[in-house]
């Protein structure tokens, strides 16, 4: 378009968060339908709908493949770089920006936005050596991230700068976050991942949401893809001081009757003197047996 574009990056290189997202693999997008995608948006769906219609997941795939990032579609219609490296996505994107004439300056923090007649007129930046400079511009795009990961540059500057311009800032709260349980995780379970399970979120005793996929036990609670997807609702409820429970279904493909029948078959295949722990070993991961037996007071 002939516009001169300057990208001010606070860190030593752009896209620090992209490089670590998706466990370092970078889940770029998802090939679900528009309605399915928007059904996952907790608030502001109309705003997201407009953005989606301008640049949907197919457009995302086409863009990255055109700039040299081969993509693969995995289980759950998730799209990843074929290399499995988030680094490749970041570097290709930066290279493309430079090819388009974008000037990128690093170690540069935007401290203030200036206006004239209610229009953006410039910015003040602070460089790594402590010096400052005012740069004239006609447009400023705030792309600062939130306040969730200061080590990547997300320290909440965007909220402060938007507030300077008179925008209303709603209270921020965690989202896409692991959850802390009411008791520490038993050591044998730490870093253990359950796959192909269901997690049901209950708020004040009522089922609020359910997700399927992977869950990982952390030292203080649970994480993993399904927990991240449920965390927004859980956090909102916790802030409102409501009771929050997470219930796990290790066999979501089976109905209660089917599971009961399987337990009966496994039990009948064992002798009467076989410890119940041996029966559990046929139904749940071995690393969970000791804790399940202890909590259920089984021998």
Which residues does each predicted region cover?
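A conserved short coil-to-beta-strand element within the FAD-binding core of flavoproteins
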Residues: 106-120
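An anion/pyrophosphate-binding glycine-rich loop and adjacent beta-alpha core
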Residues: 12-14, 19-20, 35, 70, ...
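Glycine-rich loop(s) and the adjacent beta-strand/alpha-helix scaffold that form part
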Residues: 139-185
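Short beta-strand segments that buttress and anchor functional surface loops
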Residues: 122-127, 201
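Conserved N-terminal/central alpha/beta ligand/cofactor-binding core
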Residues: 10-103, 108
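Core beta-strand elements of the Rossmann-like FAD/NAD(P) dinucleotide-binding domain
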Residues: 128-139, 210-213
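N-terminal Rossmann-like FAD-binding beta1-loop-alpha1 element of flavoenzymes
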Residues: 1-7
């Amino acid at each position: 378009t002939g516009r001169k574009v300057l990208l001010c990056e606070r860190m030593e290189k752009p896209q620090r968060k992209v490089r670590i997202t998706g466990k370092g693999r970078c889940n770029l997008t998802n090939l679900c339908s528009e309605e399915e995608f928007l059904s996952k948006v907790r608030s502001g769906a109309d705003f997201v709908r407009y953005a989606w219609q301008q640049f949907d997941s197919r457009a995302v795939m086409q863009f990255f493949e055109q700039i040299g990032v081969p993509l693969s579609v995995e289980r759950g219609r998730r799209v990843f770089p074929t290399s499995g490296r988030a680094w490749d996505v970041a570097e290709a994107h930066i290279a493309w920006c430079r090819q388009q004439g974008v000037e990128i300056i690093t170690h540069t923090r935007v401290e203030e936005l200036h206006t004239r007649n209610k229009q953006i007129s410039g910015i003040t930046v602070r460089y790594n050596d402590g010096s400052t400079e005012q740069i004239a511009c006609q447009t400023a795009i705030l792309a600062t991230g939130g306040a969730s990961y200061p080590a990547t540059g997300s320290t909440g500057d965007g909220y402060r700068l938007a507030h300077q311009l008179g925008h209303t800032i709603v209270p921020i709260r965690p989202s896409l976050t692991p959850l802390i349980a009411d008791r520490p995780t038993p050591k044998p379970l730490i870093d253990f991942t359950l796959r192909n399970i269901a997690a049901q979120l209950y708020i004040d005793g009522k089922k609020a949401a359910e997700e399927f996929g992977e869950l990982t036990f952390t030292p203080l609670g649970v994480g993993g893809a399904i927990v991240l997807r449920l965390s927004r609702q859980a956090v909102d409820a916790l802030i409102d001081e409501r009771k929050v429970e997470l219930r796990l279904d290790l066999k979501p493909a089976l109905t209660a009757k089917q599971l009961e029948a399987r337990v009966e078959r496994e039990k009948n295949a064992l002798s009467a003197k076989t410890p119940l722990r041996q029966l559990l070993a046929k139904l749940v991961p071995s690393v969970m047996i000791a804790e399940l037996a202890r909590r259920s007071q089984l021998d």
